[in-house]
């Protein structure tokens, strides 16, 4: 068991002793157990699963951020984290359509705008998939 904190700009989403944390990183899905080697890496949108002995796993949808695995503690710092059942499917569909429409006009966009709409599209697609909506 080890202490885990999941933090967003709005505050602490989860804080407690856990057995395992499973999260998507830029290098793929990783599982963190007690005494994991030190690690600092980027988190990508997807599912965060927190396993606590004798409880059902807690699952969250998370967006971009970082995970900091220290010898005695794990901190997940992400832009957003919320229960999968809390995903606003209609809102995410609208954001996906908006991003796709803007990206079709990419000649008129700056590189920064293109990157922002790509992130918006990726985020919406992943959150919709986590909510059980087929988008691809």
UniProtKB/Swiss-Prot annotation:
Top-level division of the source organism's lineage: Bacteria
Coiled coil: none
Residue ranges crossing the lipid bilayer per the database entry: none
Keyword Cell membrane: yes
Entries under Gene3D superfamilies matching the protein: F0F1 ATP synthase delta/epsilon subunit, N-terminal (2.60.15.10)
Keyword match Acetylation: no
GO molecular function: ATP binding; proton-transporting ATP synthase activity, rotational mechanism
Keywords: ATP synthesis, Cell inner membrane, Cell membrane, CF(1), Hydrogen ion transport, Ion transport, Membrane, Transport
A Pfam family that the UniProt record links to this protein: ATP-synt_DE_N
Record's subcellular location: Cell inner membrane
GO cellular component terms attached to this protein's record: plasma membrane; proton-transporting ATP synthase complex
Main location: membrane
Membrane topology type: Peripheral membrane protein
Summary of the function given for this chain in its UniProt record: Produces ATP from ADP in the presence of a proton gradient across the membrane.
Subunit structure, as described in the record: F-type ATPases have 2 components, CF(1) - the catalytic core - and CF(0) - the membrane proton channel. CF(1) has five subunits: alpha(3), beta(3), gamma(1), delta(1), epsilon(1). CF(0) has three main subunits: a, b and c.
NCBIfam families in the record: ATP_synt_epsi
Family: Belongs to the ATPase epsilon chain family.
Record's protein name: ATP synthase epsilon chain
């Amino acid at each position: 068991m080890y202490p885990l904190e999941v933090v967003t700009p709005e505050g602490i989403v989860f804080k407690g002793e856990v057995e395992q944390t499973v999260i998507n990183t830029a290098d793929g899905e990783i599982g963190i157990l007690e005494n994991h080697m030190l690690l600092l890496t980027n988190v990508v949108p997807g599912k965060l699963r927190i396993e606590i002995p004798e409880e059902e796993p807690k699952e969250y949808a998370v967006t971009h951020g970082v995970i900091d695995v220290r010898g005695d503690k794990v901190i997940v710092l992400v832009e957003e984290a919320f229960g999968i059942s809390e995903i606003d499917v209609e809102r995410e569909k609208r954001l996906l359509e908006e991003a796709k429409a803007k990206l079709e006009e990419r000649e008129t966009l700056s590189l920064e705008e293109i990157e922002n709409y790509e992130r918006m599209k990726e985020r919406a697609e992943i959150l919709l998939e986590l909510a059980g909506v087929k988008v691809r």
